[in-house]
Amino acid sequence: MYIQVLGSAAGGGFPQWNCNCVNCKGYRDGTLKATARTQSSIALSDDGVHWILCNASPDIRAQLQAFAPMQPARALRDTGINAIVLLDSQIDHTTGLLSLREGCPHQVWCTDMVHQDLTTGFPLFNMLSHWNGGLQWNRIELEGSFVIDACPNLKFTPFPLRSAAPPYSPHRFDPHPGDNLGLMVEDTRTGGKLFYAPGLGQVDEKLLAMMHGADCLLVDGTLWEDDEMQRRGVGTRTGREMGHLAQNGPGGMLEVLDGFPRQRKVLIHINNTNPILDEDSPERAEVLRRGVEVAFDGMSIAL
């Protein structure tokens, strides 16, 4: 299985266009050793030719331009994207669909709840129906696994994660299973398994068991501290309120990942306020000391 990190930042990217926190300002001033990042999305393939896009970020055009296999140039109009899987209906994971309209129809896999949001509060399915067949919905059931024809050797097993629906959603304050998913993806030829959960608010025993069965853990790296947005003066909500488990402290993501010495461990969906973006910071050093990697745009993983 080939895993390509197209975007590794949280919503807004890094640096965020309207932010002057210490990280964003430091990057622009050249006083911070850091790498710019686009909003999170990955692509998966079982052959390096046919790709499945997991989430479609607002930065999708630049992300596709940066990854040559996404333009195989076999015809006048071509793409390496053969299907799209949406893990939720958040703005920063779905807006990129608008930029893919020239390539419609697209096979889009998502849950009932995500499809409901994307036909009501943010009706992308309705809007794009006017472009050559638009988005063709394939339902993700919350039980069992599914296979996408373009990559027949990849088996997708979804699992619901506790998180709120987007602010625009008609059921914003009425959460349902299927609002937010993680994925276990297995290459049935190599046996390699990816645990992918860019929005992970809490880890229970069931999730721990799944993580132990994976070879690579690509997980939520949004915040270093739960109250980071408050500390940086750019927000009022905590990580837990937003559905993100912070890395630092008792019960934090790093402590969770300490329990997986065998697995490759990678943080993704990193917020612009997170000090691990500063490559010279003690927080970045602590992450690396504990055997955890920080995802970057263009990162490639093979399982």
Swiss-Prot record:
A GO biological process held by the record: pyrroloquinoline quinone biosynthetic process
Pfam (any one): Lactamase_B_2
Pathway annotation from the record: Cofactor biosynthesis; pyrroloquinoline quinone biosynthesis
Keywords of this entry: PQQ biosynthesis, Transport
Keyword Transcription in annotation: no
Domain of life: Bacteria
SUPFAM superfamilies for the chain: Metallo-hydrolase/oxidoreductase
InterPro entries: Metallo-B-lactamas (IPR001279), PQQ_synth_PqqB (IPR011842), RibonucZ/Hydroxyglut_hydro (IPR036866)
Family under the similarity heading: Belongs to the PqqB family.
Biological role: May be involved in the transport of PQQ or its precursor to the periplasm.
PANTHER family cross-referenced by the UniProt entry: COENZYME PQQ SYNTHESIS PROTEIN B, HYDROLASE C777.06C-RELATED-RELATED
Protein's recorded name: Coenzyme PQQ synthesis protein B
Gene label: pqqB
